[in-house]
């Protein structure tokens, strides 16, 4: 699904292309572009195409577990893709056993010495959000978020926490508006590809919170419908 600025996500990779990318980033002390796949675009030589907007991310806490690389991605600045640079090799199916990075590089290095196993891109880095969210609007949003979580918890029959408890938990971290808090809310609430891309491409903080408000309202309606169906079955 991708990442938002100022948020973190633990990741596991095992494909040679991602291992090469991480090696390059660590050696050069540079970020990588964390971008969701665009479901509407055609494949690029068999590779899933990237979406328009992504987040420059730093890899931290790298460790090996068997054939897997484990690390934490830290989201930083947003970017817009201008041009995709294709991978040196088309996508291939290797089954359960992947070749090494070195073996794959040997197959293209003579013809394409600057090539990489992973997709790259020319990008435009986007500035931080402009504008500020009124305190009353932010308070209303946190209230709505808490209500949404309580409804979801009730449907899942999970913790059984009430609105007052959930609201208190959210208020500990989100009592005052901050861009960091806004992006954290996006990472938690936005699940649809389109709304996540719209948020990443926004210029103003009020655009982002409008996307969040609409998403929560839509989810509340859906969950109310599911709850009514469950009640009718009982």
Each model region followed by its residue ranges:
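N-terminal low-complexity, acidic/polar interaction/targeting segments
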Residues: 1-234
């Amino acid at each position: 699904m991708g990442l938002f600025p100022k948020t973190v996500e633990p990741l596991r990779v095992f494909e040679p292309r991602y291992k090469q990318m991480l090696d390059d980033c660590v050696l050069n002390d540079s970020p990588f572009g964390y971008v969701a796949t665009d479901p509407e675009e055609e494949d690029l030589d068999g590779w899933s195409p990237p979406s328009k907007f992504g987040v420059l991310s730093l890899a931290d806490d790298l460790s090996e577990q068997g054939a897997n690389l484990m690390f934490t991605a830290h989201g930083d600045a947003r970017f817009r893709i201008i041009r995709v640079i294709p991978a040196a090799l088309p996508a291939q199916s290797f089954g359960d056993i992947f070749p090494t990075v070195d073996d794959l590089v040997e197959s293209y290095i003579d013809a394409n010495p600057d090539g990489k196993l992973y997709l790259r891109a020319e990008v435009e880095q986007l500035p931080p959000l402009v504008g500020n969210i009124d305190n009353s609007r932010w308070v209303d949003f946190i209230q709505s978020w808490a209500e949404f979580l309580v409804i979801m918890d009730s449907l899942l029959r999970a913790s059984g926490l009430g609105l007052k408890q959930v609201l208190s938990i959210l208020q500990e971290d989100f009592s005052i508006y901050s861009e960091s808090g806004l992006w954290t809310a996006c990472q938690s609430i936005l699940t649809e590809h389109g709304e996540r891309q719209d948020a990443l491409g926004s210029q103003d903080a009020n655009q982002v919170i409008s996307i969040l408000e609409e998403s929560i309202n839509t989810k509340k309606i859906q969950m109310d419908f599911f709850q009514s169906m469950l009640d009718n079955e009982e």
